[in-house]
Amino acid sequence: MKTPAQWKAWFESEEFARQTDYQGLLGAAYSPSGTHLRLWAPTAQSVRVDLYRKGDGGACIGSLPLSPWGQGVWGVYLPGDQHGKYYHFNVTTEWGSVTTADPYARAAGVNGARSMIVDLARTDPPGWEQDKRPVIPASKRSVWEVSVRDFSQDPASGVRNAWRGKFLAFTQQGTTLNGDGVHPTCLSYLKRLGVRYVQLMPIFDFGSVDESRPLTRQYNWGYDPANYNVPEGSYSTDPARGEVRVRECKQMIQALHAAGIGVVMDVVYNHMYRFDNVLNRAVPFYYFRQNEDGSLSNGSGCGNEFASERPMARKYFLDSVLYWAQEYHIDGFRFDLMGLYDVETMNLLRAELDKLPGGRDILMYGEPWQGGSSALHRYEANKNNLAMLNDRIGIFCDDTRDAIKGGCFNAREPGYVEGKPGSFWDIGGAVAAWCRSDKFPPHTPGQIVSYVSAHDNFTLWDKLLLVRYERPEFGAVDRAALAQNRLAAGIYLTCMGLPFWQAGEEFARTKKGQGNSYRSSPALNRLDWKRAEQFHGLVDYYRGLIGLRNAFPRLGAVDRASPNAIAFFDLEQPLVGWRLPALPGDGAWWGALCVYYNPTEQEQPIRLPDGRWKLLSDGTSSSLWRGDSRILSGEAVLAPVSATIFGLV
């Protein structure tokens, strides 16, 4: 029996690649006349498939051996219409025999233990063939991140009870707070807010929630993948029937597209729920990165990490992402711990997505870091290697995040909006999407995701209160924190790059100071739709900034020249001010923007550049641009703790 170190050497040898490289179809290839099952298992001594009528329980209705078809592939043909049959494989290697679901399964029963043969055409909702990705120019992109569960779990959401926390909640039209008919929630709220992309936290089948049990006391974000090509069953109305989760996931995407909103899928290929998983049961050790002694590398911090550089692991990764893009019409992909993927694999994926109809508009961005030390010996897809990545692969910019609100690992550390001395230098870097910085200059501003909050760490509201108070009252309306919240939004929503924020940031979302709520209670994690009404002024501030940004396309420019067109003013610290001219013919409402940030608690006089300047947004209202606001020349005064925006008329 080989040791793990010997298997590592064999898997990474040219001889192994020559004998086992396979670029054909894997999984269940369905047709009405019969289904081919193919499993790549080059270390197997034998493979058997067991068939079932149900996805959970019930007797086996037949077992068939798979035959070796070459290049490490085992296969069998099942004649007749097999739609709705469930199966798993029994794989025998030198380690013994194990039962596993199909790594390429596209549907599954409860908890994904059995895969399902599925006619995907039968899962298409009416009108699915006509569903198209919304055409969203770079200048109008903005991303709102949410969990399917959090979106509608609140009883006040107005969503029917059976759909709360489910895919179908996104399809319900006209929801309002407690059904009052006045205050929009869920999809109606998103349409009014004006956001153009929803980033969904993991929607593939994950392992930490038992789909066979009530969900009232179960919760997890889902960063623990079990079946990569199968939607999560707890988000469906019937996890026992494999086709239901597929259909309802498509219905969700279709409804968002109909509202003009793109869907970004948060994908977690960097690790799996546990090392005993569908990939490792099929081919022990192959899919997971190893140290020189054969032990598992743990750059994910979760006990295993995906070996993207190994050819058949890379194929699996590419096949899976492309499947979601094609079958589910996904508009973008956010990569968890992208620093655990190699640059070559990420660039290959970008090239493959670009080949799809409309594929060049599919977003790709990720976290440019790792969760620990990794054995990846090729160039990592991280911030240090940004210059090696395709210029349409973006990164979350923690420099922007920390400069604006303070470090995320120290709850009490302030940032620019809380008055941290010296932080104004990094604010200037953030405005130009770091294209004029020597820290890590990107190819274009489009590579930078500008943000201050995401699902990880503290909500923005909680962070602001933790910096300001020893014992915060998170549920209270705090005017000082509101001003800082508006300033933070006013900064990153006027920075170049792709603006992104955590759902509910715009209504002071709180998790009561919990900085890592991945498995906290549903009540703590869900969106509190009552706060959207309570903090409606803050919601309107975000809404106005989104509209203002859309009215000045150059803020969302992806060309390398635009950041260099920003002229920064020589102002007394810690004020930051800058001017950006519009591009000729780009449809901008104003000839230029002048933007000023004032983090101090005093009014600050400034002198405007020559010309007539309309006040578009101040520290309390971001919708002045929609009406007949003041026209100024010469002197102006900045309100305390404010972002103030002027447009050249």
What annotation goes with each model-predicted range?
Residues 41, 84-87, 628-649:
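C-terminal beta-strand-rich structural cap/linker in extracellular carbohydrate-active enzymes
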Residues 118, 350-351, 355-507, 514-518, ...:
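Conserved alpha/beta catalytic core and glycan-binding cleft of carbohydrate-active enzymes
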Residues 149-328, 337-357, 363, 374-375:
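Substrate-binding/active-site clefts of carbohydrate-active enzymes
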Residues 19-24, 494-514, 524-593:
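Glycan-recognition and catalytic regions of carbohydrate-active enzymes
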Residues 1-32, 68-172:
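The feature marks proteins involved in alpha-glucan
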Residues 29-45, 565-609:
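Carbohydrate-binding surface patches
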Residues 52, 477, 481, 527, ...:
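C-terminal accessory region downstream of the catalytic core in glycan-modifying enzymes
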Residues 39, 89, 146, 200, ...:
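Conserved, mostly hydrophobic/aromatic
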